[in-house]
Amino acid sequence: VNLRMIHSESINDSTSKHLLKDLDDILVAPGFGERGIDGKIIAIRFARENKIPFLGICLGMQCAVIEFGRNVLGYKDAHSTEMNPSTEFPVIDIMEEQKNVDKKGGTMRLGLYPCSLKPGSKIMNVYQAAEISERHRHRFEFNNKYLEAYEKAGMIATGMNKQNNLVEIIELKDHPWFIGVQFHPEYKSTVAAPHPLFVDFVKAAIQHKKLQIK
């Protein structure tokens, strides 16, 4: 595996093709805050439109939701209330139990939580299981007010925390491999036992490369 680290602040409409065209998959990593958000969203659009395998982790998943809202559903102002509290389309919003939290230190949704996977989904094929548990570190989540519209347009919630009805995993119906996860699979991945998401992501990259060679 040859890794290419690309700072999202270097990605814009004029540089995206040059920076991203030769990649066999694109990972948008976790993070916080507004810095580099526009570049992440542009990279995700490139992956979606060019059928490049994509994995978004935590903020990376949230950026995928924002990108889809803006460029597929036409929610031009779609954003997370973390970056834009007054957005007309808060497709990512603070979790209900976090709204009255004043002290931010150590008060995020932390730790291991269960997740139910949608039968027949790509993610269920990755895990080969119907129920999983993954570790979390976040305050913001997919806004279920928009879930029906997203699913009708092809972005499907394929992993849910049934206890709180939280969207934990999204994937695109008409894409070879496009998955976003709210949790952190890297917390459960080691050299000796790599996480199945990363294993399948690399397999998707290999398949993409083979198709480009043809």
Report the location of each language-model feature:
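Short, surface-exposed acidic
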Residues: 77-81, 130-136
